[in-house]
Amino acid sequence: MKFLVCDISGEMQRMIQSSDAILVNSPVRCLNQAIIERPDAVVIRFGDIALRERDALIELCGALKQNQHTKGIGVIALLCSKHRSVVERLRDAGVEYVRFLAKSKQPQTAIDVTTIKPEPKDQVDVQLEILCPYLHYSKIDSRHEMTVCGAYLDRMVLGGHRLHEICETQGHLQCEYYLNPRRKS
C-alpha cells in the first residue's frame, strides 16, 4: 500500500521508515500530492499545533473527500488526544478512521506507516460512541482549550482521572452528570 502522510509539525520526518510513504508538511501540498500520486490512504497527523492549523487540517480532510480525484482515497486522522468536537468535525468532513496516538514522555521511535491500517474500533462513529456527548471545549489561547462538562452547564473543568477514565470512555454512561444533566442554573 502507498501512503501519503501529512504532518505540519514536522515531528514525523525522522520517524517514518517506509518506502511506501510520501511525507508532506502542508495541507496544500497534501492535496496536490493526493491528486498526483493517488495513494491508497492519506494519513493526517494532528499534533501539538495551533487551533488555526488544526482547523486547516480538518478543512483539508473535507477537501480530500469532496475532490473528484481524491474522494475515493481513505483518510485516517492521527490525534494526540481525545477531542469530541474534533472527531465530530472530522466525521462531518468525511474522515472514515481516527486513531489516537499514545502520549509518551520518551521521544517516539520510528513509525512504520504500513502498520497504521485502520481497525473497526478506529471508525469515527465508534469513537464518538465512546466519548461523552457532554464534552465541551473552551478556548484559552491560540493553542489550547480546556475541557468542560456540558452536563454541568460548562461550569466544571475536566481533567485527570475524571476526564481520561470516565468522560473519554464508556464509563461516562454511569456518570452522575451524564445521567442527570443540569438544565438551568
Please name every model-derived segment:
Residues 8, 23-26, 79-112:
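Output/docking surface of receiver
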Residues 2, 72-76:
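Proline-centered loop/turn at the N-terminus of a beta-strand
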Residues 17-19, 71, 92-95:
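Short, structured coil segments at secondary-structure junctions
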Residues 1-9, 16:
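Conserved acidic segment of CheY-like receiver
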Residues 107-185:
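Cysteine-centered metal-binding/redox modules
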Residues 40-66, 79-80, 86:
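Conserved phosphotransfer microenvironments
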Residues 36-37, 64-72:
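Conserved phosphotransfer cores of two-component systems
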Residues 29-32:
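Short alpha-helical segment
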